[in-house]
Design a protein with these regions (language model features):
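Metalloprotease/metallohydrolase-associated module, dominated by Zn2+-dependent proteases
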Residues: 26, 111-137, 153-185
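N-terminal secretory signal peptides that target proteins for export/translocation
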Residues: 1-2
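Short glycine-rich loop/turn motifs that provide flexible caps or phosphate-binding loops at active sites
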Residues: 9, 146, 150
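Metzincin-family zinc-dependent endopeptidase catalytic domain
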Residues: 52-142, 149
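Disordered inhibitory propeptide/activation segment of secreted metzincin zinc metalloprotease zymogens
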Residues: 5-11, 18-50
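A structural signal for well-ordered alpha-helical scaffolds and beta->alpha junctions
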Residues: 50-57, 172-176
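A generic secondary-structure signal for well-formed alpha-helical elements
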Residues: 15, 150-154
Length: 185
């Protein structure tokens, strides 16, 4: 009987110690895109010629895990859900996503706060200071800012708060899954 208890205890310890738990969880903003994520239009402003935006839009739509995200490019910014521009921002900031209501009033700026209410559209500004940086060329900054426009807050993976990474971080399952929790499908 004593050997049986030791054997069972040994198995229990082996299971507990041999099991890894993924503690990473993507997080969301209190407010999200009010029009949902199935049929989002975007526009590239004339200054947003770098950042690999079109490719990064596709990287969010077509993941190995599937999602109902559908984003299409539009020739102007009338009624779009996400607009892309570039401007000079402070050093260390690769891009900023600002959030607006249906009356074109800014309700939150990515520089200082997250949207606390649902927003009608988002405006992404790339920092011209980093137009030649590897994180801009490989699309990491665009991918990160698109995540914000979809309602995802800073966490790990592609949503880590950093412009200095040279790693081409992909859209991961945690960030794909949070879209399901936010918008449902």
């Amino acid at each position: 009987m004593k050997k049986m208890k030791l054997l069972i205890s040994g198995f229990f310890v082996a299971i507990v110690l041999g099991t890894s738990v993924d503690t990473f969880a993507a997080s969301r903003f209190p407010g999200v895109l009010s029009r949902g994520i199935n049929g989002i239009s975007y526009w590239l402003g004339p200054t947003a010629t770098f950042g690999n935006t079109d490719t990064e839009i596709r990287n969010w739509m077509y993941t190995p895990w599937g999602n109902p995200l559908y984003i299409y490019k539009q020739g102007n910014n009338y009624g779009t859900s996400i607009d892309f521009y570039s401007t000079k921002l402070n050093p260390g900031i690769g891009g900023v996503t600002d959030f607006f209501d249906g009356r074109d009033r800014m309700i939150a700026t990515g520089m200082r706060e997250a949207p606390r209410i649902n927003y009608y559209y988002a405006k992404i500004n790339y920092n011209t200071m980093y137009s030649r940086a590897s994180s801009m060329k490989n699309g990491t900054i665009a991918r990160h800012e698109i995540g914000h426009a979809l309602g995802i807050a800073h966490s790990n993976g592609i949503m880590i708060r950093s412009v200095s990474t040279n790693t081409n971080l992909a859209v991961d399952k945690a960030n794909n899954d949070i879209l399901a929790r936010i918008y449902g499908w």
